[in-house]
Amino acid sequence: MGPNRIYISVGYSTFGMLVGFSAFIVWNVVYKQPWTAAMGGLSGVLALWALVTHIMYIQDYWRTWLKGLKFFMFVSSVFSLLAVAAFATFITLSVIEKQSLSDPKSFYLSAVWSFMTLKWAFLLGLYSYRYRQEFADISILSDF
């Protein structure tokens, strides 16, 4: 990744982390909706994980720990499956209970945050895969 592109990714991950943690606090304190809060908080944690991935890339830490990137890809796939299951569950519950789209306590917002969690899980896996490919190529060349 180019130097400007990596810093854009760092900024985007930071913004995602702040928004996710804000959703966690707001839906716990103001709306008393734990499911939306949980999915918002999980989205923030995955954004934080993506941020850590970028920072470790900038500090050139991944060169010596490619197994860590493999672990991050595994975690990404687990949380992707969890997010898809949560999305389907929340949409189903919203339809069955005939909830309003504009109600802040509806399961539709939980489904939205489940989708955001899926997005961050996918991005974590994508970034980990790209960094692993980059450093795997470099480590092959350094063996000669």
Curated annotation (Swiss-Prot):
Encoding gene per record: slc48a1a
Function statement: Heme transporter that regulates intracellular heme availability through the endosomal or lysosomal compartment. In macrophages, is the heme transporter for heme-iron recycling. Essential for macrophage iron homeostasis, transports heme from the phagolysosome to the cytoplasm during erythrophagocytosis (EP).
KW Transmembrane helix (keyword) present: yes
Gene Ontology CC entries for this record: endosome membrane; lysosomal membrane; lysosome; phagocytic vesicle membrane; plasma membrane
Any one GO molecular function term: heme binding
Catalyzed chemical reaction(s): heme b(in) = heme b(out)
Designated name of the protein: Heme transporter hrg1-B
Keywords for the protein's UniProt record, in alphabetical order: Cytoplasmic vesicle, Endosome, Lysosome, Membrane, Transmembrane, Transmembrane helix, Transport
Pfam families: HRG (PF16954)
UniProt motif Di-leucine motif: location: 140-141
First-listed, main subcellular location of the protein, grouped into a coarse class: membrane
A biological-process GO annotation: heme transport
Family of the protein in this entry: Belongs to the HRG family.
Protein origin, superkingdom: Eukaryota
